[in-house]
């Protein structure tokens, strides 16, 4: 990624600029407003309710408009004199240019959506989830929601058009990740009224006039527009798309070949590491962490093998709740403890408090153990830590501490909330996402548990090590699947033999990596970089090193590429040395 940013600088230096350079904030704001107007779902999740009556245009024509917009924005950015910028303006400028170049490169590989729907990402998951982030405070909100429901058939038609283009061009998904989708659509269609789609009509606020009218209109939209659209997509997948899907699972087997996976690796890690280099890093880290796990097994006096210990951890009743409320409250207790010690780790904290909510049961079996859902920009709702309460016999107590530190605080909630509250940054940076930075920070945060008084129970320590091992194993299996010719069964077996996760979870995870090439690489690569920078700062500053200040130096500027983070921390080290 350093090479990418360097090339940006060279290109800018050679580009003629207008005598009257446009203000950066005008360019950023123009692009941001275009993004919100063309992605109403994004606007809703950020608390901007101007487009709550709409859904994105999912047609091929809309994709071409998007690609043209990225090109136009890059041209406008290159008219600005880069050497006239400094500080945050320069960081923002370089990030903006980089993001546009990445979008343009993606379109060069394939100009439309590569996978418009999968078992982990598609309208059957995203649209119901969107409802929980939509306001229902007055009649206007309900009119907006009815209009959005009415737009679902056109949204589905666009998805089908994208899938048809996939079939024409050979950019079809692997069968294994599409096979569950018709069932997901079927279940949602049969339970629309009790799903998130129908919930707003069961709890209409008292201030909304004639609630029975809205309830009736809602039922009509669901039965006459949403259900037929879902059935149409379900039938299309079964009769046309699924038979055309590929048996191969590697991203490198797509028409663009290995360059496509190389792009996804660069996108997921913001580094220039090759797939083979990442694979080798993963193997080294797996061996190191497994040795630490063996020491925990020795500590608790377990005499069997690693595989036998994982069976014990995943079957002994002492490690599981039998009631979902108890599980949720257990996570809430951990968060309360974290908040007590957080000031010892950070110089300043966000105002927004983390909440815990259950993942909706419908479709939850294809969802991870937990994830983080950010709050809107206006702070009207906190982000929340979503917990999977299905299959309680797989939600182990020994992984709860490390999971909380990752998904909530000081992981995703803390990092994302601080970014959202940094009003001096342009909106695209406050709400941006670099996988290696965000997930790397969250994995690094798990490691902070030792300094915060967690993992005192050896089984919880094993849980933390297992989570780190899991992220290291991802480096092995993601590159194995997409670059080195691994089969799905080989990848599942590797996770089963090298992690303490339940076999069913490992199967779900492998299918996730198949559906989302390169994404799983960011966690470990990002964590290793932050650990490296902390060690560098500690050595350079000695007894002047301030851990609280270091942490805020890492996250106070919003999500950034790892190469930019390294430059930023080098500058911070120099500033600290100058102070002393």
Feature annotation, model-predicted:
Residues 1-18:
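Gram-negative bacterial Sec-dependent N-terminal signal peptides
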Residues 19-580:
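N-terminal maturation segment of proteins
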């Amino acid at each position: 990624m350093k090479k990418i940013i360097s090339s940006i600088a060279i290109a800018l230096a050679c580009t003629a600029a207008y005598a009257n350079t446009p203000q950066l904030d005008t360019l950023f704001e123009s692009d941001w407003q275009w993004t919100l107007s063309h992605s109403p779902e994004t606007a809703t999740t950020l608390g901007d309710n101007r487009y709550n009556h709409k859904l994105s245009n999912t047609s091929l024509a809309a994709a071409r408009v998007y690609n043209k917009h990225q090109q136009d924005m890059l041209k406008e950015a290159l008219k600005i004199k880069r050497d006239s910028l400094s500080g945050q303006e320069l960081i923002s400028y370089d990030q903006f240019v980089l993001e546009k170049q990445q979008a343009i490169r993606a379109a060069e590989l394939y100009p439309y959506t590569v996978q418009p729907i999968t078992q982990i990402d598609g309208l059957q998951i995203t649209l119901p989830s969107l409802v929980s982030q939509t306001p229902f405070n007055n009649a206007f909100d309900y009119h907006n929601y009815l209009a959005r429901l009415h737009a679902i058939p056109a949204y589905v038609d666009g998805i089908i058009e994208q899938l048809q283009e996939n079939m024409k061009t050979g950019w079809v998904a692997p069968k294994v990740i599409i096979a569950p989708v018709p069932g997901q659509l079927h279940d949602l269609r049969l339970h629309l009224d009790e799903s998130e789609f129908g919930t707003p009509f069961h709890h209409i606020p008292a201030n909304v006039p004639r609630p029975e009218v809205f309830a009736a209109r809602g039922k009509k939209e669901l039965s006459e527009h949403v259900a037929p659209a879902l059935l149409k997509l379900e039938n299309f997948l079964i009769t046309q798309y699924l038979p055309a899907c590929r048996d191969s699972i590697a991203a490198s087997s797509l028409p663009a070949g290995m360059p496509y996976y190389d792009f996804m690796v660069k996108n997921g890690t913001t580094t220039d590491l090759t797939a083979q280099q990442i694979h080798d890093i993963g193997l080294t880290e797996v061996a190191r962490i497994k040795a630490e796990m063996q020491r925990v097994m020795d500590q608790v006096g377990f005499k069997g093998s690693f595989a036998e210990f994982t069976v014990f951890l995943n079957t002994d009743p002492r490690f599981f709740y039998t009631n979902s409320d108890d599980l949720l409250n257990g996570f809430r207790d951990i968060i309360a403890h974290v908040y007590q010690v957080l000031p010892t780790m950070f110089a300043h904290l966000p105002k927004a408090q983390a909440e815990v909510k259950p993942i909706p049961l419908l479709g939850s079996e294809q969802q991870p153990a937990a994830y983080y859902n950010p709050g809107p920009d206006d702070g009207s709702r906190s982000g929340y830590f979503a917990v999977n309460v299905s299959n309680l016999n797989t939600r182990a107590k020994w992984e709860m501490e490390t999971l909380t530190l990752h998904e909530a605080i000081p992981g995703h909630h803390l990092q994302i909330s601080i970014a959202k509250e940094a009003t001096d940054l342009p909106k695209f940076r406050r709400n941006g996402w670099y996988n290696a930075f965000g997930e790397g920070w969250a994995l690094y945060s798990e490691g902070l548990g030792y300094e915060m008084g967690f993992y005192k129970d050896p089984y919880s320590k094993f849980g933390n090590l297992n989570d780190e091992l899991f992220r290291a194993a991802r480096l092995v299996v993601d590159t194995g699947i997409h670059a080195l010719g691994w089969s799905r069964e080989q990848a599942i077996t590797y996770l089963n033999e090298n992690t303490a996760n339940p076999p069913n979870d490992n199967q779900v995870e492998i299918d996730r990596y198949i559906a989302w090439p390169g994404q799983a690489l960011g966690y470990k690569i990002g964590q290793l970089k932050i650990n490296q920078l902390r060690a560098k700062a500690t050595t350079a500053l000695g007894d002047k090193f301030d851990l609280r200040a270091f942490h805020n130096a890492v996250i106070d500027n919003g999500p950034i590429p790892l190469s930019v983070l390294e430059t930023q921390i080098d500058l911070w080290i120099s500033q600290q040395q100058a102070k002393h």
